[in-house]
Amino acid sequence: MEEFQGYLEIDGYQQHDFLYPLIFREYIYALAHGLNRSILLDNVGYDNKSSLLIIKRLISRMYQQNHLIISANYYKQNKFFGYNKNLYSQIISEGFAVIVEIPFSLRSVSSLEATEKEIIKSYNLRSLHSLFPFLEDKFPHLNYVSDVLIPYPIHLEILVQTLRYWVKDSSSLHLLRLFLHEYYNWNSLITPNKFIFSKSNQRLFLLLYNSHVCEYESILLFLRNQSSHLPLTSYGIFFEKIHFYEKIKYPGDEVFSNDFMVSILWFFKDPFMHYVRYQGKSILASKDTPLMMNKWKYYLVNLWQCHYYVWSQPGRIYINQLSKHSLYFLGYFASMQPNLSVVRSQMLENSFIMDNAMKKLDTLVPIIPLIVSLAKVKFCNALGHPISKSTWTDSSDFDIIDRFVRICRNISHYYSGSSRKKSLYRIKYILRLSCVKTLARKHKSTVRTFLKRLGSKLLEEFFTEEELIRSLIFPRTSYSLKKFYRGRIWYFDIFCINDLVNHE
C-alpha cells in the first residue's frame, strides 16, 4: 500500500471516487508488472513495449466503432506494432486490477492502523490449517452437515454489478464491461477450471470472483441473522486477500457461530449454524433438526435463482448426518468417529464401571486421489508403481534430489494433521523410489547398484524436519510419548494448497 501512496496520489482520487484517469498513467502498468511478475506472459520485449502511448492507442481503438483491433481476420493478417490479442488483454487487465484494488487497499490500511497489535497476534488465522481446530472443537457437538458448491455467475454483468458496491466510478466499470465483452469469450471463463485458476489475467479474475463470493456471504449472513432468535455479536465481512484485516478485527466472520454469554438463554440458541468456506466450496453444519437444514437449503436455492440467475435444484444439495458421512474438505477426508473409554469409579466399598462414549473428528489422507495426482505428473503409473521422471534427467543430481525432497516434505507437512500417518508411507515410498529410478536412468545404471553406492544417505534426505526433531527428542519406548509422536499437528504457516493435494 505504501507503493500506492507514493506513486498514485491516492488522496485526490479517493476524495472524488474517480479512478478512471489512472488507466492512462504509465506507472500503473509498471507497478502492475512488479505485482504480476510471476504470471506474466512470456514476451521478451514486454518491458520496452508497454509504454503510455501504446496504452492510449489501445484504449482509443477499443472505443472505435469499427473495432478493427478485435477482428479475427485482422489478427490473422496484421499485428498492431508486433502485439497479439493476448498481450493487449494482459496489459490492460493487469493495470485495471491494480486500479480497482485501490478502494479495498485503503480500507485495509485503515483497519491495519486500528488493529496493528491484534494482527501480529492473530497472523496464524491466515493458515488453512487454522480451520481444522475449529472443526475439531465444534463438529462433535453438531448433527447434520451440508456440502455446498458456490455456483459461478452465468453472466459477466452480475460481476460488474457486484463491483458497483465497492467502486463508485462508473467510467471504470464501463471500461471493465467493454474489456470483458470484447476481449474474452465469457462462456469459456465461467467454467471452474478456467475462471479461478487461469494463468493469464489471474489477478483480475480473482478480484472479480472474490467480490462475487463476498456479496454471496453477506446475503447468507443476513439470512442467518433473520433466522436467529437473538442478534449476533459484531462481525466483519472477510473479503479474501483484500479484507483480511477485517477478519482479524472481527474474528467471527469466515468461520462463525452463535456464542451467547448468558447460559440461561441456551434454549434460544437452537438454530446453531456454522459456516466454513475455502475458495468455491462451503460447508453448513447445524445442531438442529433436518427441518432447519432443509429450510437453509431452500434459502440457498432461492438466493441463487432470484439474485444470481443460476438455476439450481434442491436435490443437488445433500443433507447428511455427521456420524454417517465422510466429508472431503481441504484435501482431507473428515468424519466423526466414536471414542470409547471405560471409567472406573469407586465410592467407599462399591465400584462402578461406566462406558464413556465421545465423538471426535477423524481426519484421513485420501490415498487414492494422491496416487492419481502423482500418476498425472509421471511419478508413478496408474497402479501406484514408481517410475522415473524422464524430464528431469537433464538436471544435476543435487537438483533432482532437492525437487523430490521438497515435494515429499510439502506433502508430509500438509498432512501432518492426519489421524493415521501410515497411509503417507506409501506416498513417501513412491517418491523415494521414483527419485532413485530417475538418478539411475540418468547415470545409465540399475536401481540396486545405485542404492549400494549411495547407501542410506539418500533416504535420510526424505525425512521431514519434524520427524528428525521428534526422533532426537522423544524415545519411542514410552507408550504416551509414542502416542504423542503419532498425534495430529496443525501448522499455521500453510497459506495455499499444493497442486498434488488439490484433487478437485
From Swiss-Prot:
Signal peptide: none annotated. Belongs to the intron maturase 2 family. MatK subfamily. Its main location: plastid. This is Maturase K. It comes from the Eukaryota. GO terms for biological process: mRNA processing; RNA splicing; tRNA processing. Keywords: Chloroplast, mRNA processing, Plastid, RNA-binding, tRNA processing. The gene is matK. One of its GO terms (cellular component) is chloroplast. InterPro entries: Domain_X, Maturase_MatK, Maturase_MatK_N. It comes from Aruncus dioicus (Goat's beard). GO terms for molecular function: RNA binding.
